[in-house]
Amino acid sequence: MHSILISGAAQGIGAAIAQLFYQQGYRVGIYDIHLAQAQQLADQLGERAHAGLLDVADYASWQTALSDFCQWAGELNILVNNAGILYSGAFENTPIEAHHRTMAVNVNGVLNGCHSALPYLKQASFARVINLSSASAIYGQADLISYSASKFAVRGITEGLDIEWQKYDIRVLDVMPLFVQTAMVKDMDAATIQNMGVHLSTE
């Protein structure tokens, strides 16, 4: 039975991914900084779902989560780096701490996940990494400067590792949707997104 670990899986896109792969018969790891919500989803899904605590910006947290998951699932076949945050508004009106936090979660979180998961992925019967990027990785976006920059970085990490990890037979892929109607974007202040409209949902 194949397995998948999803970061930021307690709600939104991560929860939708967890539900989809559970329906496909996978062992599903629902890891999130909000453990109670992750556990609630795991309980709803059933015995092939497992919840755990994960702060993606903390490398040690990744090491603990991966060890916990692989002890439960047996191996790691698919890693989904989904966790991400977004601050919207004029660049100069956004506190520098918010810009730094965006990069720590959205970029360092992916670096930490890929780096710490590699030993487990190399041992698996087959292995894939899926990084959640964004259409903002293709063009810079006003009012979303640090978010857009972080997704450019994720795109670069993905393309580079997909080439580099061919030697391990590990594919590294990304998904670059337009903005999806989730809690993360509900209160965002970005005129460009409002003009385009948000037409995707997790349903």
Stretch-by-stretch model annotation:
Residues 1-28:
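Canonical Rossmann dinucleotide-binding motif of NAD(H)/NADP(H)-dependent dehydrogenases/reductases
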Residues 35, 52-64, 96:
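The beta1-alpha1 cofactor-binding region of Rossmann-like NAD(H)/NADP(H)-dependent oxidoreductases
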Residues 90-91, 95-100:
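Substrate-binding pocket helix/loop in short-chain dehydrogenase/reductase
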Residues 114, 150:
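Active-site helix of classical SDR
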Residues 134:
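Residue(s) in the substrate-gating loop at a strand-loop-helix junction
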Residues 139, 160-170:
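Active-site-adjacent segment of SDR/Rossmann-fold oxidoreductases
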Residues 174-175, 190, 194-203:
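C-terminal helical subdomain
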